[in-house]
Amino acid sequence: MKSGSGGGSPTSLWGLVFLSAALSLWPTSGEICGPGIDIRNDYQQLKRLENCTVIEGFLHILLISKAEDYRSYRFPKLTVITEYLLLFRVAGLESLGDLFPNLTVIRGWKLFYNYALVIFEMTNLKDIGLYNLRNITRGAIRIEKNADLCYLSTIDWSLILDAVSNNYIVGNKPPKECGDLCPGTLEEKPMCEKTTINNEYNYRCWTTNRCQKMCPSVCGKRACTENNECCHPECLGSCHTPDDNTTCVACRHYYYKGVCVPACPPGTYRFEGWRCVDRDFCANIPNAESSDSDGFVIHDDECMQECPSGFIRNSTQSMYCIPCEGPCPKVCGDEEKKTKTIDSVTSAQMLQGCTILKGNLLINIRRGNNIASELENFMGLIEVVTGYVKIRHSHALVSLSFLKNLRLILGEEQLEGNYSFYVLDNQNLQQLWDWNHRNLTVRSGKMYFAFNPKLCVSEIYRMEEVTGTKGRQSKGDINTRNNGERASCESDVLRFTSTTTWKNRIIITWHRYRPPDYRDLISFTVYYKEAPFKNVTEYDGQDACGSNSWNMVDVDLPPNKEGEPGILLHGLKPWTQYAVYVKAVTLTMVENDHIRGAKSEILYIRTNASVPSIPLDVLSASNSSSQLIVKWNPPTLPNGNLSYYIVRWQRQPQDGYLYRHNYCSKDKIPIRKYADGTIDVEEVTENPKTEVCGGDKGPCCACPKTEAEKQAEKEEAEYRKVFENFLHNSIFVPRPERRRRDVMQVANTTMSSRSRNTTVADTYNITDPEEFETEYPFFESRVDNKERTVISNLRPFTLYRIDIHSCNHEAEKLGCSASNFVFARTMPAEGADDIPGPVTWEPRPENSIFLKWPEPENPNGLILMYEIKYGSQVEDQRECVSRQEYRKYGGAKLNRLNPGNYTARIQATSLSGNGSWTDPVFFYVPAKTTYENFMHLIIALPVAILLIVGGLVIMLYVFHRKRNNSRLGNGVLYASVNPEYFSAADVYVPDEWEVAREKITMNRELGQGSFGMVYEGVAKGVVKDEPETRVAIKTVNEAASMRERIEFLNEASVMKEFNCHHVVRLLGVVSQGQPTLVIMELMTRGDLKSYLRSLRPEVEQNNLVLIPPSLSKMIQMAGEIADGMAYLNANKFVHRDLAARNCMVAEDFTVKIGDFGMTRDIYETDYYRKGGKGLLPVRWMSPESLKDGVFTTHSDVWSFGVVLWEIATLAEQPYQGLSNEQVLRFVMEGGLLDKPDNCPDMLFELMRMCWQYNPKMRPSFLEIIGSIKDEMEPSFQEVSFYYSEENKPPEPEELEMELEMEPENMESVPLDPSASSASLPLPERHSGHKAENGPGPGVLVLRASFDERQPYAHMNGGRANERALPLPQSSTC
């Protein structure tokens, strides 16, 4: 398993190699990243995935505690992860679908504890959403402890994995609480396919708008394209072209130079289980896992890190492996750390298979039973040690025979005193080796033996002879008194002089000890152990097997003979009592041949307190609608005297989708369960209700579990602990230099309320539509001397998060522990969903009545819908009223009622179920009145005929007068004084644009328009020679009024007259039936404002920035917009709301004039309501429009200049820093926008021409195009209106006639024709200074092409019959 750390030089080296070969190894523009990416702590590290197509290794995303908005992060290039994907504790991440929309294959070449996909403790994750994930080649999945994760029961993992038996999916949000809805099921038009899982045949999807992809059965095990065409057999996951192994998303076997192949071609080698590389590539890969290695090797046509078992490199410079003769030699050792310390079986395991140890061998094994066999398995092959061998304090060793193949100690490095073999203080060592079958040589250096009471001196002398060291040792090197002699005595007492304690360390010093001959004082040994009671002795815990409960530390003599010796004991447990004593190690003899030494008395000392660990096994259950019972177990490590607990709780917002969906379909109502566990708590104030089975059976009891079930649960619990330990050990990297932050101190700074017996003062309105976005405060309470509490005064049937913190006696200084938490829901309150107060009714026209009723004040969670039962004789009719409809109208309308007496009752439905029916309300529907006698008809008929004739005469007169006035008019448009009026002439009549409803298919939501939701879909036969066309489908809300529906269709009717490449096309209308649909050309890149903002360079992008548009691209956008507006102008239409938000960007980046009004709800803040009028786009309006409500083509040109400013600033808000009222005054007083930073002069001069205060001084759209036509792309000539046959130059007689129509305005027009082509002085900044008309010093000519046209041609803006496009809905202009 690879390390979990993300940074490090090996990763950098891998990255350099992969980057250099990426273009030749993968057909896309992305890179191969590896050998693993670890993203932790900072969400901005996700930028490392920017260009990754394949991650050759693992991907970790974990430990990001600060909730962030991940919607701006999207990595569509990533398609394959060759090892595994791990997500752990990433706050704020709600779905993986936007993050990795095209992740298709997880190969599982190496696994994380047998899993290829691990999602663990992701508290905010709502769905997985990897809708393009098709294959997990090896390994299982583990999805655990994700409290808000849904859409797990709707995924058929058998379509992704070969076997699902090892999958582990537990501890997530219960499926009954999720209300998982696959696309189309709510509208009863399901879009997903069905499969059977656990005998349930159901739809399969990833999210509410993403189905799970299934290939046709004819493909078998082959992948398929998005259009369900079978891929080549060598493709895995998906492909772009059927039966083509060069367009696979991933390869089933191996990838080589853009082609998926079943085996690597000759001269290439398998690498990382998925691709083929050549020899040069393999030779240049650094071996990240072994500093001693010479790089990767080639064996059995595979490029790998090391030779397999039984093989060895044939030379140090070769990349190839050869079979070993006998055991394979293996050199071990570290150039930096030359001494290999063996203090446990784990450390010995690092020498498994080693035959030559380059360096020194230090054996220090103090405890362990039957450890010799383990050491022989791991160290038995060692033959040569190049340095020294030192064996000390190894009380578990009886013999050194586990080094059964050791034959040579070179002694190239020696201990002080020239020792190459050093044996000190091994209490149970009895034998070195069997010298009858051993040949060991110590080539250089001496031997030293001391304090081995069970090792005979004769054994030592035998080793002298065999190893050839006899004569090298002095008399003191092999002491006959302390080897082989168990007796020892200490005549002097050492006294401790000082002790200093921390939570995990102790410093002790003792007085200077001076034996008669100071040279015989070798060192000190400190013994210490945990001692809960002060009753330990020196010999506790020692036995013949070498077990010793005392820990020992060697202490060298202080360099200063006068200094006091001391030791720092570290790695201790907080708030733990330790017993400590010290021995002096000497060689001094007394007359009776006993060792003379010194020893201290046993000292008892306690470490300081520390922050406790978290409480364990937190459980919660509800015993009433306002109480939650919470129980937990004490922490494993109190690290002090446990004093109290802090209990904190927070109300959780409802799921957002509950506010959006219409739950009038009974089978779609989400189910919630309260915390119904059983906890033995003395404070329970309400007797829980016992479920009765009926009859004499008495209360229902759970069946006892069988022994097999208990054993299975036990094994599963053990396996779960092993996995969690493995997870934490793999991903948590120690950072000793980092200071720990106090959890409770941080938490307490954000608390909004605190009380020992807290009452939740909940004043939030449950019906607030924004409630699901509310962050509720935490409340807290202190619990003393017990591990349980009851939280009271809670809301009924509401979900709460409960955090428990442990606190010991030092909590005021150190803080409390981190929290362990649980989610629990209170019980529903009886009667909470009942509708209070009376139900009233109001008569309405056309045999209708309107019922009104109050909403439940404190319902069980959330009211989802209301049901009305009504009838004249019996209540046999039902009407469902959604939550959204009730909030909009405050009641419901019953239509098409027959005359007579009626009764009605109403019932509310919440998350917990149904409330009670209201008392019946009685109402009467009168019959329609009829003429009482025939005379009324005789009298009324002539009157009606006269009225009709009079009306026709008035209409003819008005029409004639309007036509005459239009001939004399100036082409201006005035805002209506009664914009809410509409006549019968506005009613929409179906025509040749009508499309059959069955030809339309909706796929996904694109956004909210002025009248309703806009969807992406497919239409059949709406475009000539195209069987199917991707389209945008505009809808009108179900609750829309008749006027709104007519406006919706009339707005579409306006678009019927347009046929221009740079104006979004109308493709059809579906007006028959409900809902009404308008079919538009699909603009895949959205509105221009959003597109421009997506091009903004982000801060700290690590050299991976999106490139803002160049000058040529800006000019191209401007020309395309101007061409669309010129077309509207030629057809005598005035737009009135030209802005970047109302321009759309096509797939090929062409900018077009949008379908007017689609973006009103999205950019509501761009509009301003002046007085009691409708919404006005004041920041884009010309001075004359703001003053007089006048809208002409000239005012559209002003707005066009603002659009140019938006393009140059990447859609900043115009007049930033000014309120709407200030903008109103500023523009009317002559103020202009600043020149944007880094704006080209050419573009800004064009803006200034559009912002002439005198409307007649502004250029026309045709003149604007003429000034920049040379900068446009060649394709512009082929598609534009400017170069089309429709754009014919006007006849001279027509120009003269139009000039004669406006004599009253000629005094404000300069007589010099060149004035029309000159720029104005630079406008003032936001200081309020006005921009004067006319040329000034330093003016520049914008384009000579202005002069090529007839002088004053751009002044001819007042044209006969000029019409205006309607502003978006709710505007009165």
Swiss-Prot record:
Residues 1306-1322 have a biased composition (Low complexity). Its EC number is 2.7.10.1. CDD domains: FN3, FU, PTKc_InsR_like. The gene is Igf1r. It comes from the Eukaryota. Tetramer of 2 alpha and 2 beta chains linked by disulfide bonds. The alpha chains contribute to the formation of the ligand-binding domain, while the beta chain carries the kinase domain. Interacts with PIK3R1 and with the PTB/PID domains of IRS1 and SHC1 in vitro when autophosphorylated on tyrosine residues. Forms a hybrid receptor with INSR, the hybrid is a tetramer consisting of 1 alpha chain and 1 beta chain of INSR and 1 alpha chain and 1 beta chain of IGF1R. Interacts with ARRB1 and ARRB2. Interacts with GRB10. Interacts with RACK1. Interacts with SOCS1, SOCS2 and SOCS3. Residues 1292-1305 have a biased composition (Acidic residues). Residues 490-610, 611-709, 735-829, 835-928 form the Fibronectin type-III domain. The modification Phosphoserine is found at residues 1280, 1284. Glycans are attached at residues 51, 102, 135, 245, 314, 418, 439, 535, 608, 623, 641, 748, 757, 765, 901, 914. This is Insulin-like growth factor 1 receptor. One of its GO terms (cellular component) is membrane. Activated by autophosphorylation at Tyr-1163, Tyr-1167 and Tyr-1168 on the kinase activation loop; phosphorylation at all three tyrosine residues is required for optimal kinase activity. Inhibited by MSC1609119A-1, BMS-754807, PQIP, benzimidazole pyridinone, isoquinolinedione, bis-azaindole, 3-cyanoquinoline, 2,4-bis-arylamino-1,3-pyrimidine, pyrrolopyrimidine, pyrrole-5-carboxaldehyde, picropodophyllin (PPP), tyrphostin derivatives. While most inhibitors bind to the ATP binding pocket, MSC1609119A-1 functions as allosteric inhibitor and binds close to the DFG motif and the activation loop. The chain crosses the membrane at residues 937-960. A motif (IRS1- and SHC1-binding) lies at residues 978-981. Residues 961-1373 are cytoplasmic. Residues 742-936 are extracellular. One of its GO terms (molecular function) is insulin receptor substrate binding.
